[in-house]
Amino acid sequence: QNKNEDSNDVIQGIKIEQQNEKILVNNSLSVSDIKLAGLYDPEENGLSIDMWSNSNGEDIKSTLKNLTSKDLSKFSEKILDIALLTNSYIPNTNISSKEFLDFKFDYLIKKENFDLIKEFLIKNPNLIEGEKLIKFYTDHYLSNSQLDKSCEIFEITNLISSDYLTNFKMYCLIHQDRRDEAQLLFDLKTELGDLDKFFVNKFNILMGYKKSNEELSEKNILYFHLSHKTIKNFEYEPKIETPKFIWNYLATSNLLKNAEFVDIENEEQIKLIEIATNDEVYKEEDLFKLYMRFQFDINQLLNYRNAYKLLEDYEARALLYQRLLLTSEIPKKLNLLSLLKKSFDQSNLPNAFDEKLASLLKNIPEDEIPSNYTTFFMKNKEPEKLAELKIKLNNKVFHQSKVLNYFQNKTSLPQVEKETNDLLKKIKKNKKYVFSLKDIIVVESLKSDGVQILRKYQKLYDYNNNLPSEINTMIVNGETGLVLLKISEIIGEDNLEDLGIESVDYIVSILNELKLVDLRNEILLKVLPLKV
């Protein structure tokens, strides 16, 4: 009996219950019972589990649709991360649970952070709607020939119902040498009539009931993988229209033809290699080794400026590259590199020459670049790693002064209160000092945290903090999630350093009202201090 109960816990491709020695199958689980879904603890960022409860779903949907269509800056994306992935009650006004969860799932998929997806599934094991995430996760790792990584997810999630994922789980059980469990799940699905002929045939071959056959399917990555594993002497020639997941699988399974064996007289094969390189399936270095195998006469190499125009685009690239390797003059090198780059771009292959181009430019001293190639050089060279600048305190300017230590959690509230009033005393004596908006932002943030400003310093500046009524209403109603979306929308594609100080003031004022001090402090320390 204990053994049966253990099996019921393990085999969850379908919901299985055992009563009176009869197996019952429930294949219709609803998302409507889900009340909570998320990844981060609300308290981590000073939020509440009710952060979405009072918001109108129409506002949420329109704002999220706008945000997900943009290429957000790092900080804007961080706010969206916190808003969407914090564990919270699901809103229920003018938005269904499925709609809201789909925004979370689509966002995680767009980020392509598979560790984050795994963590989300671990913390939300009963989300049947999470099958979209599970499929994305399993397909990614299988297309990269990492079957064990694909299979591990089935030990985490409690509920799957789709035929595809159930088939995937059965195959994983076979792969893990848990054939009895695979057979039980197979028998259950057979009773339901949910198994297709292709999978049944491959299952029987893998279980040893039938001999291997030559049946191949490109329907999905699982079926293509099963084809590979059950066909003797498996060979597959990809075509231009071959799906990318198959290209990835072939590359990571060492099933692609080595570039040195590609027939350079075969135009389609060359173009396939170029497309695969652009899609990061082939290495750029392999493509350029292929270009080296082309044969050109001395006149073509000497008169490349005219000769390459008479060739097919891929042949022209081979000629330009070979001529580049014979060139030592920097202006001529840059001319050849720019012609190569232009040729790749015109053939819609912008990613096939980015790493190689950056590497070649790295070997050219920047001070020897002619002025007419400066833009080309700066745009395509390898980005320099910027050294992280340190904050330098300057007590002559309030927003650059030692009070910034408080926002780095280096000083206590009583200490910063004393330091603030001491600095304001000096500023009051200095008749030439004019309070800037940056100074005001710091003082208002300190006041928001409870710093008491002495009455004699309270009129050093005029400041009216009038937030729009729409935002004010959201704050009063506890619609923190929606307010965070609005902040992310305001920042959009801009880096914090590029925001106007009025925008910084507006955002910091909202965060002060919400008491979201960590996010506020990050903005202040990015925008205000003097850095060296």
Where do the language-model regions lie?
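Generic helix N-cap/helix-start motif at coil->alpha-helix transitions
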Residues: 94-101, 126-135, 147-148, 160-168, ...
